[in-house]
Amino acid sequence: MAESIIIRVQSPDGVKRITATKRETAATFLKKVAKEFGFQNNGFSVYINRNKTGEITASSSKSLHLLKIKHGDLLFLFPSSLAGPSSEMETSTSVGLKAFGAPNVVEDEIDQYLSKQDGKIYRSRDPQLCRHGPLGKCVHCVPLEPFDEDYLNHLEPPVKHMSFHAYIRKLTGGADKGKFVALENISCKIKSGCEGHLPWPNGICTKCQPSAITLNRQKYRHVDNIMFENHTVADRFLDFWRKTGNQHFGYLYGRYTEHKDIPLGIRAEVAAIYEPPQIGTQNSLELLEDPKAEVVDEIAAKLGLRKVGWIFTDLVSEDTRKGTVRYSRNKDTYFLSSEECITAGDFQNKHPNICRLSPDGHFGSKFVTAVATGGPDNQVHFEGYQVSNQCMALVRDECLLPCKDAPELGYAKESSSEQYVPDVFYKDIDKFGNEITQLARPLPVEYLIIDITTTFPKDPVYTFSISQNPFPIENRDVLGETQDFHSLATYLSQNTSSVFLDTISDFHLLLFLVTNEVMPLQDSISLLLEAVRTRNEELAQTWKKSEQWATIEQLCSTVGVQLPGLHEFGAVGGSARAATSAMWACQHCTFMNQPGTGHCEMCSLPRT
């Protein structure tokens, strides 16, 4: 019997097969490895396990058989210059996924929570099919795995995409425990550092050439549901279109929670919509540079929120008397245009999903896309989507273009002297019913889209207070709705609740307090944000006694709006408030002057 065996050795440059024998010593085997990979004898290390345990040393006189290395085993080679396996190697087993991915990254709280859950679908005893006692189990009542396709297909409505954590359980299940599986991010670029030839376009080899991509409909999704906390959040966003007829754009701020309708599912809960600077028309949107973007993210983080997605309108009135809108996005046209898919892919690349199971420390994205558009009943509907990881890679590496005259089609770029683009294919059915492979020039974008259910809760949730006279939303100057101290004074005069926290708990108001140019409170508002986040009235009362709120009151009193409830929110005594109410602001330099003076103490100009 021949004792020759083949051992696979994985390095950062790929996997190679080494022919050896069972009785061969470790030193002899390592010499073969060094020759095959082009290393010096001491320029690398070989391990049995990916986490750098079980090193095979040249000083060992043991045979491969005694080292329990069998035919077909996979060993791991690390050059001496590499600090660790996580920078280049792929993930393998379920234990290995945790140890050999990116152990230093901190995943989102929802991912940490779901990774510890059982996830199995428990079923009760079937009185007709089960023939055992109440404590027994059979094939009709044994718990199902969270990725069971038959169970997902029989839900109402059926679930086409399993959750991401269910997908992880599927990869790490089975006899091999995911030994040959890797959460690998797709790359469409030529690998750098290949010294065997001239750089592109003068040379390329199979070592540095990216693989061709065959588009498949993604079987899993990173987010399974989008839920707006209440109708007011969405209605205020739609008010812009109702008043102007122009399309509008916004960022969704909220949190990720467990979606219990799907095994190990994730829900994106939307608490507020921030509207950045933009130019909208009836059929187009242009985003402008937002100097406040980082500040908004910081304030949201202190409120326990984060940017979870983006939303835009695509609404056209059909009958203004009935209040109906046109039903334009359907199976006969498109659900997302190629341009929107590229935009969604760009947003998802900017907001990657932190994942310790990937060598890169991230895999996919939980950033969602919401569209306010007409439904089959000609009423406004909210639809949710993501684009696949393949689409993210094509967008990130600038390989995908939109089609100008066909919004439902994209176009994979062709290679040029400046950029190599791998071939992109998709599978289709021809007129004879045969499955054929087509080059993605053009490409139906339906291969890139993942649909997500979008809902409103039966019992509304309110992270922020709801007012009959809310504070104006930012960047709506075109409507005559501006954020200034006059609008703040008007808001305070119309909201005279005795609970200060209810009055101040408005996302757009808090942003104004931080970002206004007259009296920005970015350095002194942390206590108030903590009060809003925890719904703590005592903390809010403590903050309202600060000098900052007293100054805000003084500025509001100079705009000519009576604040009947000002005494409830003031931070000083009654006599001080009386003196403050008599102070006046110079119309020329805004200096606050003492009562009884007719000229400004700062610029000496008359009061009127």
Swiss-Prot record:
It comes from the Eukaryota. Keywords: Acetylation, Chaperone, Cytoplasm, Endoplasmic reticulum, Metal-binding, Nucleus, Zinc, Zinc-finger. Residues 226-363 form the MPN domain. Pathway: Protein degradation; proteasomal ubiquitin-dependent pathway. The modification N6-acetyllysine is found at residue 179. A zinc finger (RanBP2-type) spans 580-608. InterPro entries: MPN, Npl4, NPL4_C, Npl4_Ub-like_dom, NPL4_Zn-bd_put, Ubiquitin-like_domsf, Znf_RanBP2, Znf_RanBP2_sf. Its main location: cytoplasm. GO terms for biological process: ERAD pathway; Golgi organization; negative regulation of RIG-I signaling pathway; negative regulation of type I interferon production; proteasome-mediated ubiquitin-dependent protein catabolic process; retrograde protein transport, ER to cytosol; ubiquitin-dependent protein catabolic process. The modification N-acetylalanine is found at residue 2. One of its GO terms (cellular component) is cytosol. Binds ubiquitinated proteins via its RanBP2-type zinc finger. The ternary complex containing UFD1, VCP and NPLOC4 binds ubiquitinated proteins and is necessary for the export of misfolded proteins from the ER to the cytoplasm, where they are degraded by the proteasome. The NPLOC4-UFD1-VCP complex regulates spindle disassembly at the end of mitosis and is necessary for the formation of a closed nuclear envelope. Acts as a negative regulator of type I interferon production via the complex formed with VCP and UFD1, which binds to RIGI and recruits RNF125 to promote ubiquitination and degradation of RIGI. Belongs to the NPL4 family. Heterodimer with UFD1. The heterodimer binds ubiquitinated proteins. The heterodimer binds to VCP and inhibits Golgi membrane fusion. Interacts with ZFAND2B; probably through VCP. This is Nuclear protein localization protein 4 homolog. It comes from Mus musculus.
